[in-house]
Structures are given as structure tokens and as C-alpha cells.
């Protein structure tokens, strides 16, 4: 197939097809994330079709534009780099043991802190805490450094272990199970409650609950620039299992 045979058509606001005659040989899509960023994806076995789709999407859409690739997929990374995108950040995926005998964590609470199990938090107060830590993260590193799944989740107390201090929620740990492997999506502590062992206690309670439920492992994604989270997870025996690259077109 020669590039001269290809035609790229925008079939919807955020969808494109690459056609060779009457055959669809590639598809492109732009998907908005909850933080407002637009992420691109292209599905094609043909390099020429990929290049033409990428060029059309980059020309049609407002910048900045983003995509995420598995770091071991060198061919896909090369396609996007050839289109002009640059690597913005790296995210590590960790395989996290849940057994307290391995992690060294227990379910004990720091002095003055109460840890509420999954489903025990009051929804309104949990939403208030979520808004507080969201604003604090945005003012510091920014939510663009966070995994996409944690940017704007629905608030379901069943997915949260929560720390309370003097009647006020101080920290949370969100765990979901999109597959058989539970995912630790977010650990966050209010800025005025840092350095009290709350994050470690939240993680200990969450992992202990998963272990008692028969889950030997969980997963977590951590931005490589997040030294505190990296240190916390590696100290309990978590191991890197994969990595993803986020690329950007400006």
C-alpha cells in the first residue's frame, strides 16, 4: 500500500478513518480526560496510515495534545515521536504485596488518628476531603502528574479507607478492582496532616483488608518524579512491573 492510495477522513468530531479505496486501514480517536486534556490513540498496522492519521489529527485539534504508550512498545513510541510528539513524563506500574509479613505494615493507627475501613466513611465528608486534597495537589505538583484514573473518580465510600483526626477527615486511600488485581488509585493526606504516618497507616489498612479477602497482590501507578510515593511503596516490597510514557504535542 502506497501513501498516495491513502485518504484520511474525519468521520466525527473526534474520530478519523484512513481509507485505501473502500477499505478502512486505520482509525484515530481523541478522548477527553476529566482534567480537560485531550489524549490521542491510533489503531493501524500500516506505518503510512498511522503517519497520515497522526498528521490529520494534530492539524485538526487544538494544542496541547497527549498520548500514552507502553514503554516497551518501541514501535508505537517511534511512530508518535516521528509525528513530532515529545516525551513529557514516565509512570511506573508497581506490583504490591498485601501480606503484612512481607510489607511490614500493620493496621495500627498513629496517635490521635482513627482509620476507617472500606465503606465506613461518611460520603459528604469524604467528598469534602477529596476536594481539599485535589486543590492542594493542583496547587503543588498538579493533577497532570497523576494517573488518569484518579483525576475525577466518583466518590463511593466502599472504595476508600479514610483517616480521621479530631472528627475531621485527614487522608484517604482509594482502591478499585477493574480486573482481578486491585488497583491502589490514590493515597492523599491533607497538607496540615503530613509527617504523621497517616499515608503508611492508610496503606497498611487497605493492603491488610485485601490480604484478608484473599488478594495476594495489588497494583499501583506512580509518576517517576514522585519521590515520596516511590519511597513508600518500595519500602514495603513493591516491585516495578511495567512503565508507561506520556507524550505531548504543543
Locations of regions flagged by a protein language model:
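Conserved donor-binding loop and adjoining core beta-sheet/short helix segment
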Residues: 2-61, 69, 170-182, 190
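Conserved GNAT acetyl-CoA-binding A-motif
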Residues: 61-72, 210-222
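Conserved active-site alpha-helix within GNAT-family acetyltransferase domains
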Residues: 71-90, 196, 200, 224-242
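Acyl-donor-binding surface of acyltransferase catalytic domains
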Residues: 44-112, 245-249
